[in-house]
Amino acid sequence: MSVIAQAGAKGRQLHKFGGSSLADVKCYLRVAGIMAEYSQPDDMMVVSAAGSTTNQLINWLKLSQTDRLSAHQVQQTLRRYQCDLISGLLPAEEADSLISAFVSDLERLAALLDSGINDAVYAEVVGHGEVWSARLMSAVLNQQGLPAAWLDAREFLRAERAAQPQVDEGLSYPLLQQLLVQHPGKRLVVTGFISRNNAGETVLLGRNGSDYSATQIGALAGVSRVTIWSDVAGVYSADPRKVKDACLLPLLRLDEASELARLAAPVLHARTLQPVSGSEIDLQLRCSYTPDQGSTRIERVLASGTGARIVTSHDDVCLIEFQVPASQDFKLAHKEIDQILKRAQVRPLAVGVHNDRQLLQFCYTSEVADSALKILDEAGLPGELRLRQGLALVAMVGAGVTRNPLHCHRFWQQLKGQPVEFTWQSDDGISLVAVLRTGPTESLIQGLHQSVFRAEKRIGLVLFGKGNIGSRWLELFAREQSTLSARTGFEFVLAGVVDSRRSLLSYDGLDASRALAFFNDEAVEQDEESLFLWMRAHPYDDLVVLDVTASQQLADQYLDFASHGFHVISANKLAGASDSNKYRQIHDAFEKTGRHWLYNATVGAGLPINHTVRDLIDSGDTILSISGIFSGTLSWLFLQFDGSVPFTELVDQAWQQGLTEPDPRDDLSGKDVMRKLVILAREAGYNIEPDQVRVESLVPAHCEGGSIDHFFENGDELNEQMVQRLEAAREMGLVLRYVARFDANGKARVGVEAVREDHPLASLLPCDNVFAIESRWYRDNPLVIRGPGAGRDVTAGAIQSDINRLAQLL
């Protein structure tokens, strides 16, 4: 087990802030506000040097050896900048103390420069901006009432000098643990970018070293999440400065992020992700200027990739070309060079392999090309090395992109007429790259983004359940399919119809208007495992499970559906009303994989009750109570029941008309109403268990088991009981209704109540549902939603509504 895997500090998080997030007084105060809102005591911060401090230090260092007057001017600019920051953020007495410490540092660094520059002096001077940032940020947090301490990472991070220094986890871990226990309950502000070698010298951690040190420190400290705050909200589908309709990606697979970083995207660096790969850390990218405007979370998700997620480009790349002599084995030479580059940790962005010309081409950014060329030159391999500059690169990144024929085709289409030097795809199929002889690439990236991401997506739909609701939805979908596609820009394909025993499946799509007729003749018996394998191998951009069953077995598969990247639209209430632990697991699984679980059809059929409750909560309201008639079936029964027809005969009529659940006892038992109440209460933000609801069942105990026919044949007891209750209510001038109630104190019940004839719950049309929402905003005059709450048409319409909503989310 690695040191990282052993580290453990449950709940602790780490926040990293870059130089642009600490550029001035306002920025520091904004960061302090973020820490107040988004962090807890014992959380950690890693900070970069403020603003352009690092560049100023490099300038000062270089000029100190050639132009002492200019060096002094840079030093004074740096001094004014840091002193202005300190004075603008702290009270005079505390500011004086920090300014004194800063001036002392500056004088010591100046003395170092006078004695000459070597690697150790360079690192000591250039890495000092982080020390000043951490010291000042700690003081600002304390001033804001957030107990904090600062920590110089050189006290525990151990790394030896190299082109890409690697932190020695074995040496660093115990040193950090000793320091962590010394500051209980405080936010620890740690310097980024710097470490120390065994000789006691400062070692810089290289390009993007602060981000790398943040994830490395987070892994050593055992944090649950590292959030990198910068001036962008996360990873976009393209550079938003080049592509105006680029969209923020809320979730990115770790392998996709790693490939994007390998391709030198500015928002990510490959070394930043190394500690994430070897630990259980979740990595989040967020904007410090607009923290509530979305983010990108990088996780180890199970959802299968189906194509490109990002297009990226570079307008300044180089090619190192190696001409293998005709007398040498070309494949052997390629293998040897590949091993040399891997050992030196300078992997190329792309490789051009030209067997016919005995030519190898290695693509690098201009910053890395000279180092790679030097490494290959020093290797002394037989052959000719040369460097070509001024080339460009475009790439598509996404798990499965090279296996997506549509995306590949559009990539090649966009490259037509372009000066392509060579194309390349990564071994794991996550990227497709083209190196161009000339740039710029902006118009090419715009066209590629438009072609890949705004073109029509194919959405596969698999319908589980072909009874009343399923058959009616098929009719509705057949009518609306073309309109839906035109409105959303997606192609919706009915890929399958499944019942409890058989399935009719086709990747090419089924005709919804004739699917049921074909089902009877062509459906085959299929076990659960083979059906699941068929679904996992789907060719669509997204697959949606439509669950219009009342099956517990299917509800139990929602976790698997989420983990394999399927969306679920449900009229089945069993998952939404399961115990809290299972319910949270399902919700978390869909959130983690970036898939959606929509269930508007579970309550109120087509009425927008779930949406309304969710909108009130999201807008800042608090739900105090919810009451009403939640069952269109029971609404119809109690409005029809006047004593002239036996109650069970009315139940039979409702069953024949498709107004009830497949087993009408599910309605009469109150379980269906209870599930709706639990779903609504949870939507309102309350943690309620199904067994907390007091339920009055109308099903006699001796009829709970057995067949439906047995229930209808033995309904005398229920009929007699209902007549007695009806007569008792009439004597008081009241009417009977089956009512559900829940309040903020956790009291919940469903059952028969006698209410006044002028009560909102009394004056209904048959099959109507009524929902009365009392909230902080609607305390004196409850918000009432009323309308048809049972029947095939309205429930099928609710399923269709959620398909529309899913299209918007996608």
UniProtKB/Swiss-Prot annotation:
* Catalyzed reaction equations: L-homoserine + NADP(+) = L-aspartate 4-semialdehyde + NADPH + H(+); L-homoserine + NAD(+) = L-aspartate 4-semialdehyde + NADH + H(+); L-aspartate + ATP = 4-phospho-L-aspartate + ADP
Q: In which pathway does it act?
A: Amino-acid biosynthesis; L-lysine biosynthesis via DAP pathway; (S)-tetrahydrodipicolinate from L-aspartate: step 1/4; Amino-acid biosynthesis; L-methionine biosynthesis via de novo pathway; L-homoserine from L-aspartate: step 1/3; Amino-acid biosynthesis; L-methionine biosynthesis via de novo pathway; L-homoserine from L-aspartate: step 3/3; Amino-acid biosynthesis; L-threonine biosynthesis; L-threonine from L-aspartate: step 1/5
The molecular function terms in GO held by this entry are: aspartate kinase activity; ATP binding; homoserine dehydrogenase activity; metal ion binding; NAD+ binding; NADP binding
Binding of NADPH occurs at I469, T549, K573, G791
Give the binding site residues for L-homoserine: E661, D672
The alphabetized UniProt keywords are:
Amino-acid biosynthesis, ATP-binding, Kinase, Lysine biosynthesis, Metal-binding, Methionine biosynthesis, Multifunctional enzyme, NAD, NADP, Nucleotide-binding, Oxidoreductase, Sodium, Threonine biosynthesis, Transferase
Q: What is its EC number?
A: 2.7.2.4, 1.1.1.3
Which residue ranges are recorded for the region named Homoserine dehydrogenase? 464-810
Q: Region Interface: start and end of each range?
A: 253-463
Instruction: Kindly list the positions annotated as binding NAD(+).
Output: I469, V498, T549, G791
* Keyword rRNA-binding appears in the UniProt entry: no
Active-site positions, per UniProt? Answer: K676 (proton donor)
Q: Does the keyword ATP-binding apply?
A: yes
GO biological process terms, alphabetically, are: homoserine biosynthetic process; lysine biosynthetic process via diaminopimelate; methionine biosynthetic process; threonine biosynthetic process
Q: How is the cofactor bound?
A: A sodium ion is seen in the structure; a metal ion may subtly affect the relative position of the nucleotide-binding region to influence enzyme activity, and could increase the stability of the enzyme.
Annotated positions binding Na(+) = V603, A605, L607
Amino-acid positions noted as binding NADP(+) in the UniProt annotation, renumbered to this chain = N468, I469, R501, T549, K573, G658, E661, G791
Lineage top rank: taxon? Bacteria
Matching SUPFAM superfamilies: Carbamate kinase-like, Glyceraldehyde-3-phosphate dehydrogenase-like, C-terminal domain, NAD(P)-binding Rossmann-fold domains
The miscellaneous comment for this protein is: Aspartokinase I-homoserine dehydrogenase I and aspartokinase III also catalyze the same reaction(s).
Q: Please report which protein family the annotation says this sequence is part of.
A: In the N-terminal section; belongs to the aspartokinase family. In the C-terminal section; belongs to the homoserine dehydrogenase family.
Q: Known PANTHER family for this protein?
A: HOMOSERINE DEHYDROGENASE, PTHR43070
Describe the protein's quaternary organization and the partners it interacts with.
Answer: Homotetramer.
Per its record, how is this protein called by name?
Bifunctional aspartokinase/homoserine dehydrogenase 2
Species the sequence originates in: Escherichia coli (strain K12)
